[in-house]
């Protein structure tokens, strides 16, 4: 009975979503059919409105074109001049360490026949996926330098990346703003690439010193343990020799000693040894 009820529940769970999907398709088909066959009066009204709009646009021809021209002019103000050539050289290298000074030189060459006035040099870090979003904007360097035709000028700029930016990529944008003798402003993107801020390894800190001390202690303990093991093995392998004196006269050459002395020595060794007290008492009794 329990198995039969579970089968019915499974069938219901499968059939219910299928019914909803089929019902949704039917309703969608009905709505699409209504969209395919609209009322003819609605089409006629839309056509009349479109004709009126076209007539109004023909009557006012210069309203939108003037705005477009102004926008194009505004965009044209920030473009570079064809007679201006720029170069960049990073003095501190292509790496950008965090919380360290980054210096670079910008070269400006006037290849035209009119003077150029270089106004400012600016740099900024931007979001890599969207260069319109500023992450860190540095102070613009005012220059106000006039570069004559067929002349060159170089400018130095430096900035310091923030410490929290270390280890992450950012878009570095370096812009040079200048104008010609007629007063038209121009802007050249000297550098516009994604760079990674590098985190420099600092000197010895507390953790590093503690690690070195710990490793030194381990090495000393290991050397001391090896020394103890080797010393114990050498003691077992080479027993200590104890020096003993001669136990007899076998290895001694006594041929040079007189015979009388040898007889006395043999008698002394054969007779029992008496203590000093007995000797003194015997000597005293003899004298009495």
UniProtKB/Swiss-Prot annotation:
It is found in: Endoplasmic reticulum membrane. Residues 29-208 are lumenal. The chain crosses the membrane at residues 209-229. Residues 34-69, 267-288 are annotated as: Disordered. It is a single-pass type I membrane protein. Residues 1-28 form the signal peptide. Its main location: endoplasmic reticulum. Seems to bind calcium. Shows a remarkable charge distribution with the N-terminus being highly negatively charged, and the cytoplasmic C-terminus positively charged. TRAP proteins are part of a complex whose function is to bind calcium to the ER membrane and thereby regulate the retention of ER resident proteins. May be involved in the recycling of the translocation apparatus after completion of the translocation process or may function as a membrane-bound chaperone facilitating folding of translocated proteins. Belongs to the TRAP-alpha family. This is Translocon-associated protein subunit alpha. The lineage of its organism: Eukaryota, Metazoa, Chordata, Craniata, Vertebrata.
């Amino acid at each position: 009975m329990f198995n039969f009820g579970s089968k019915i529940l499974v069938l219901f769970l499968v059939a219910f979503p299928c019914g909803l999907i089929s019902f949704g398709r039917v309703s969608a088909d009905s709505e699409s059919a209504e969209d395919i066959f609209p009322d003819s009066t609605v089409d006629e009204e839309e056509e009349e409105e479109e004709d009126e709009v076209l007539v109004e646009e023909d009557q006012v021809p210069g309203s939108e074109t003037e705005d477009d021209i102004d926008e194009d002019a505004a965009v044209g103000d920030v473009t570079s001049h064809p007679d201006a050539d720029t170069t960049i050289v990073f003095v501190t290298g292509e790496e950008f360490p965090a919380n360290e000074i980054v210096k670079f030189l910008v070269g400006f060459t006037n290849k035209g026949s009119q003077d150029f006035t270089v106004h400012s040099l600016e740099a900024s870090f931007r979001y890599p996926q969207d260069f319109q979003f500023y992450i860190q904007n540095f102070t613009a360097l005012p220059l106000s330098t006039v570069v004559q035709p067929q002349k060159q000028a170089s400018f130095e700029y430096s900035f310091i990346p923030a410490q929290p930016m270390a280890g992450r990529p950012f878009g570095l944008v370096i812009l040079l703003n200048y104008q010609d003798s007629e007063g038209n402003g121009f802007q050249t993107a000297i550098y516009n690439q994604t760079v990674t801020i590098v985190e420099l390894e600092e000197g010895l800190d507390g953790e590093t010193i503690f690690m070195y001390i710990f490793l030194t202690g381990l090495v000393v303990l290991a050397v001391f343990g090896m020394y103890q093991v080797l010393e114990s093995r050498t003691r077992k392998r080479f027993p200590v020799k104890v020096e003993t004196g001669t136990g007899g006269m076998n290895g001694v050459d006594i041929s040079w000693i007189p015979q009388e002395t040898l007889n006395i020595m043999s008698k002394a060794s054969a007779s029992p040894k008496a203590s000093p007290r007995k000797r003194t008492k015997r000597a005293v009794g003899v004298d009495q």
